[in-house]
Regions:
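Acidic, Ser/Thr/Pro-rich low-complexity intrinsically disordered segments
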Residues: 27-86, 124, 135-137, 164-291
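Sec/Tat signal peptide C-region and signal peptidase I cleavage site
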Residues: 22-26
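Ligand-binding face of N-terminal immunoglobulin V-set domains in extracellular IgSF glycoproteins
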Residues: 41-51, 64, 81-130
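Bacterial N-terminal signal peptides
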Residues: 9-21
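N-terminal secretory signal peptides that target proteins for export/translocation
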Residues: 1-7
Length: 291
């Protein structure tokens, strides 16, 4: 005859066995950056996607017309990014505190619509949240990251620079040849594509003096337009406002002396009507455009 005490013991034994037999919860995949974070129309670029729990290989996709990707992301053989002490532990217990680099390619059609696209990676344990990738129309370059003090890198305008602020206290310096009286635009696209970078831009003139600076314009993204006071080499310095930096601190910096829109007046129009639209910015028509 079963006693209440026997029943309780049997129930506890079953519960304990089920707890031991239950599998550990799966770790859902995630992504924290793509580098470079964009590409020019009509080009194919190799990209690095930083992610957690994507393992050796995983499928991924970029949504929208005019853009295709490699079928899979594959774990990079060399994981060059790490800050802090390593704590040895069995692989089964080691978490992924730092994103691991996954390699892939992106191809953009020459007539692809400009603007944002969203990409996702997934595996049997889930799907990562969508993140942004930018299709641009200007020539692009990708920063060649090196250790040590920043080395000024010369660029030819117009250009969109794909860079990254890493490690902490990193300062990137880009230089170009300016002409007295010419107008130049420098725009950072980082926070708007999901980067934690809170950028600060500083323009240094040929005489070593500061010409212009900016921190927040489009949210945490910097923007400035200035007129060159003299002929010569100008330096564009970019860094995090608090001198932070890590793998996800990617940015796109556009420097141009060509047409660049800042805003319109009025800000909107009514459907079914014609409106004289004033374009405000650099090297834009002075007369209104009818839309």
């Amino acid at each position: 005859m079963l006693t209440p005490a026997t029943v309780r013991c049997a129930a506890l034994a079953v519960i304990s066995w089920l707890a031991l037999a239950s599998p550990a919860p799966a770790s859902s995949p995630s992504t924290s950056y793509i580098f470079p974070a964009g590409a020019q129309r009509g080009t194919t670029v190799k990209v690095i996607v930083g992610g957690h729990y994507l393992y050796e290989s995983c499928p991924w996709k970029m949504y929208g017309v005019g853009i295709t990707t490699s079928k899979n992301l594959r774990l990079a053989e060399r994981q060059g990014w790490f800050e802090g002490p390593r704590i040895p532990m069995p692989a089964s217990q080691a978490g992924e505190s730092y994103p691991k680099d996954q390699l892939g390619t992106v191809t953009v059609d020459k007539d692809a619509p400009l603007g944002f696209r969203y990409y996702q990676a997934w595996n049997s344990e889930g799907i990562a949240a969508g993140r942004r990738f930018v299709i641009g129309h200007l020539p692009e370059i990708v920063e060649q990251e090196i250790d040590g003090r920043p080395i000024p890198t010369s660029v030819k305008l117009p250009v969109t620079i794909n860079g990254r602020i890493f490690p902490r206290e990193d300062v990137d310096i880009w230089t170009f040849t300016g002409k007295k009286g010419s107008s130049y635009v420098c725009e950072v696209n980082a926070a708007r594509i999901g980067s934690p970078l809170d950028s600060r831009l500083e323009i240094i003139g040929p005489d070593g003096g500061r010409v212009a600076e900016n921190t927040d314009h489009f949210g945490n993204d910097s923007y400035l337009r200035f007129t060159a006071p003299a002929d010569g080499t100008y330096r564009v310095r970019i860094h995090d406002l608090k001198f932070l930096g890590l793998q996800p601190y990617i940015y796109r910096l556009t420097i141009t002396d060509g047409p660049w829109g800042e805003q319109t007046y009025p800000l909107g129009v009514q459907r079914g009507t014609k409106t004289a639209l004033h374009l405000l910015g650099q090297r834009l028509p002075a007369k209104p455009v009818t839309v």
